[in-house]
Regions:
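Cap/insert and terminal regions of metallo-dependent hydrolase folds
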Residues: 188-189, 198, 206-306
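C-terminal segment of classical bacterial N-terminal signal peptides
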Residues: 12-22
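Binuclear metal-dependent hydrolase catalytic cores
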Residues: 2, 7-10, 23-213, 288-309
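Short amphipathic alpha-helical "recognition" segments used for binding
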Residues: 6-7, 15, 228
Length: 310
């Protein structure tokens, strides 16, 4: 006879009932708030997961980007995986997607019974096709042979986004808008409207007039940022090592520096500015101070699991 292990004990064993971070206590119902799941960038830092932000509406988690270790950060929130309503990708750079396979698989193992809802730019379906092929044997074992997990939970339903409303229900309206991350095209930010509040996530972008338009009057703007001069300094180090590539030299063209992000927040008239994707994280306080030169509202230089209320 097959022995059935209660789901709670499985979740406990996998660490999905670990103690919550002190900044991340569960919110009351009927409101929107934001948890920064990952605030790092491609270079790995032990205390910074890859880019990922949770927008929580009435207890349902909408995940924007899924960088490395997103599942570990969700576990720190004691978050039941089936409450993930959907995942939204701003673009397909690997630092924003490397945690997606784990999020898909673990949420299924932990009880998700329906297809994972995934929204992203063109190319998302091809990425998902590869992901499912990569996991094909594992899915077969878990679904058909050993655990008899829900069949539909092993699926991903892809929604290719363009500018405009991409998701709407009784609680929340989510709008995608184009940002400037060229040569990466398309790249999107997302605007969440719920309970009379507005939260905007920039994704990766250089200063963008379109972002200012969509962020106008937002309660919270979550925006990427880098320290002015950082890329030039990094380029100088590379040159002394004989590195003739131009990757670092070009990075400043499609990201936003600290002084620029303050101007963006001021132009949009947002109430709170939350800085994420901090480059480099060790300069986060200096970055915050530079942003404050051009924006008089509240500024949060986020760490992983920082919770922000509108």
């Amino acid at each position: 006879m097959k022995q059935i292990v209660p789901a709670f004990f499985i979740q406990l064993a996998l660490g999905l009932y670990s103690p919550a971070h002190s900044n991340a206590a569960e919110p009351p119902e009927n409101r929107i708030d934001v948890v920064l799941l990952g605030t790092g960038y491609p270079r790995p830092y032990p205390d910074r997961a890859g880019p990922s932000t949770a927008v929580i509406v009435n207890g349902r988690y909408f995940i924007v980007d899924a960088g490395r270790a997103v599942v570990l950060r969700l576990s720190a929130l004691q978050q039941p995986m089936p409450q993930i309503a959907a995942v939204f990708l701003t673009h397909l750079h690997s630092d924003h997607t490397s945690g997606l396979p784990d999020l898909f698989n673990t949420s299924w193992v932990m009880g998700r019974k329906q297809p994972l809802q995934l929204y992203g730019p063109r190319g998302t379906q091809e990425m998902v096709n590869g992901l499912l092929k990569f996991y094909a044997e594992d899915i077969h074992i878990r679904r058909d042979l050993v655990e008899e997990l829900p069949v539909k939970g092993a699926e991903i339903e892809v929604h290719i986004v363009s500018e405009g409303i991409v998701y709407k229900d009784d609680d929340v309206t989510i709008t995608a808008f184009g940002v400037d991350h060229r040569p990466v095209e398309p790249a999107f930010g997302y605007k969440f409207e719920a309970g009379g509040k507005i939260v905007v996530i920039s994704g990766d972008t250089a200063p963008s007039d379109n972002l200012v338009k969509f962020a106008r009057g937002a309660n919270i703007l979550v925006h990427e940022v880098y320290m002015p001069g950082y890329f030039a300094k990094a380029r100088s180090v590379e040159m002394t090592r004989g590195d003739t590539t131009k990757v670092t030299q070009r990075l400043s063209r499609y990201h936003t520096d600290a002084e620029q992000v303050g101007k963006i927040a001021a132009a949009a008239g947002v109430k709170k500015l939350v800085l994420t994707h901090l480059i480099p994280p060790e300069d986060s306080e200096k970055i915050r101070e530079l942003a404050a030169r051009n924006f008089s509202g509240e500024i949060v230089a986020a760490k992983d699991l920082t919770r922000v209320l509108p």
